[in-house]
Design a protein with these regions (language model features):
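Short amphipathic alpha-helical segments with heptad-repeat character
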Residues: 40-47, 92, 96, 143-146, ...
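A short small-residue
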Residues: 27-34, 76-78, 129-137
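Extreme N-terminal tail/first-helix region
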Residues: 7-9, 18-19, 23-58
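Solvent-exposed interaction patches of small proteins and small membrane subunits
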Residues: 37-48, 79-82, 112-114, 139-140, ...
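Acidic/histidine-rich alpha-helical segments that form the ligand environment
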Residues: 125-170
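Short, contiguous alpha-helical
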Residues: 2-26, 72-128, 167, 171-218
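Structural signal for well-ordered, non-membrane alpha-helices
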Residues: 50-61, 99-103, 107, 150-164, ...
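Short secondary-structure junction/hinge motifs that connect adjacent elements
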Residues: 59-78
């Protein structure tokens, strides 16, 4: 595990909030995951995170899928990254759109005209971008959201595979990754948010169960 997360983003502050909650924290519900230290571990973490997300989705009842998220009782359970997601579709689309952004970031570097990871208009307030990404997909069906995420996840795996170990894990190897490495960017749009999404869905299902118990007791 990395000794510090303080160097991540201004662009670097964003990575701090996106990459490390799953890797740096440990509690009774979720043991801290070792941060990938090589390409094989990175690819395994990406694949494992996606598999666990799908396992959690498969456990959801129709009621859990159709009932909007409600974290009003404990907003911290939701976190700022997911504050605009109101259902499973929103959550999956959110993941998909951040992976699209990652592909564009890498493609721009490889085509010789690199730019910062975040679009200029959202560099100081990326939460507004989160809101925009979710809002533009309000007519997207859930099954389409699942398909889009599956496609872009597979592209993320192939994209990560195309990098060498040095390119992935050398801090500052690419100018536009600043003081961190390319692997952290892959983590920030795959394994880390996959784990956060699983926790969010578990909390949603727990909230539904608690609400039903209160109704039954009343």
């Amino acid at each position: 595990m990395r000794s510090s997360i303080k160097y991540y983003f201004d662009e670097e502050t964003v990575l701090e909030s996106l990459v490390f909650p799953i890797f740096a924290e440990s509690n009774d519900e979720h043991k801290a995951m070792p941060y990938p230290s090589n390409k094989q571990e990175l690819l395994a973490a990406m694949a494992d995170g996606y598999a666990k997300l799908n396992e959690q989705i498969a456990k959801m009842s129709e009621e859990a899928i159709s009932t909007p998220f409600d974290f009003a009782a404990d907003p911290k359970k939701c976190g700022v990254r997911w504050q605009y997601d109101r259902c499973l579709r929103d959550l999956l689309i959110h993941l998909y759109e951040w992976q699209v952004l990652m592909r564009e970031f890498v493609n721009n570097i490889r085509e010789g005209h690199p730019r910062d990871y975040l679009p200029d208009e959202y560099r100081k307030n990326y939460h507004e971008m989160d809101k925009m990404l979710v809002e533009k997909h309000q007519s997207t069906p859930l099954e389409e959201a699942k398909r889009l995420l599956q496609e872009t996840h597979e592209k993320m795996l192939r994209l990560a595979e195309s990098f060498t170990e040095e390119e992935l894990f050398t801090k500052g190897y690419y100018k536009n990754t600043y003081t961190t490495d390319m692997a952290a960017y892959f983590v920030s749009v795959t394994s880390s948010p996959y784990g956060q999404a699983v926790k969010l869905l578990k909390t949603h299902q727990k909230n539904l169960k608690t609400a039903k118990s209160k109704i039954q007791r009343s």
